[in-house]
């Protein structure tokens, strides 16, 4: 087999193998927790069982929902938590910016896309915060954000809702250090 054939075979093999995402090395506490959430966002349960779209939009929704869980659990707004939340969100926005650049969004539309994304993030965090105490309203907000073009499927919404409430129960009233420690085996 020639060198050219070997290279082509390798490229074709890689094309058909589902690649696991390559994560950069995260060392700071907010980066470590972000990486765990990012890894969780690739869990096929969201895409196969709940039928969330397996694309950049679906992954965005899953990551934002996990950010909400973290922020809700870190409701004590002392300076340490506020700094952590800000750094955590900045990491996500930096990653989102990098993703947009990788998929080729032009410089002409880049700032507009980032403004829209930032508004979407803050709007979702706000809506989830306002509705989390009322299960019906929370389900409506999940339906509207995660499955916007589908008729309501209460099974999917209820399963995701249960997932969110379980995570909140697991991490509620813990410091971010405790959340990082208890999520070592996966968020």
Where are these regions (language model features)?
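Surface/interface-facing alpha-helical segments and adjacent flexible terminal/loop regions used
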Residues: 2-65, 69-187
């Amino acid at each position: 087999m020639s060198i050219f054939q070997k290279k082509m075979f390798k490229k074709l093999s890689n094309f058909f193998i589902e690649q696991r995402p390559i994560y950069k090395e995260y060392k700071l506490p907010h980066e470590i927790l972000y990486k765990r959430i990012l890894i969780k966002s690739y869990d096929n349960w969201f895409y196969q069982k709940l039928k969330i779209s397996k694309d950049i939009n679906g992954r965005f929704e899953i990551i934002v929902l996990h950010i909400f869980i973290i922020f809700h659990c870190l409701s004590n707004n002392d300076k340490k938590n506020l700094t952590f939340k800000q750094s955590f969100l900045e990491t996500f926005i930096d990653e989102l910016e990098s993703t947009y650049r990788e998929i080729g969004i032009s410089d002409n539309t880049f700032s507009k896309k980032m403004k829209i994304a930032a508004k979407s993030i803050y709007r979702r965090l706000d809506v989830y915060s306002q509705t989390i105490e009322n299960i019906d309203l929370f389900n409506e907000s999940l339906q509207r954000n995660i499955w916007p073009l589908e008729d309501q499927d209460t099974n999917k919404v209820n399963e995701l809702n249960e997932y969110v409430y379980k995570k909140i129960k697991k991490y509620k009233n813990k410091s971010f250090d405790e959340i990082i420690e208890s999520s070592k085996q996966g968020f």
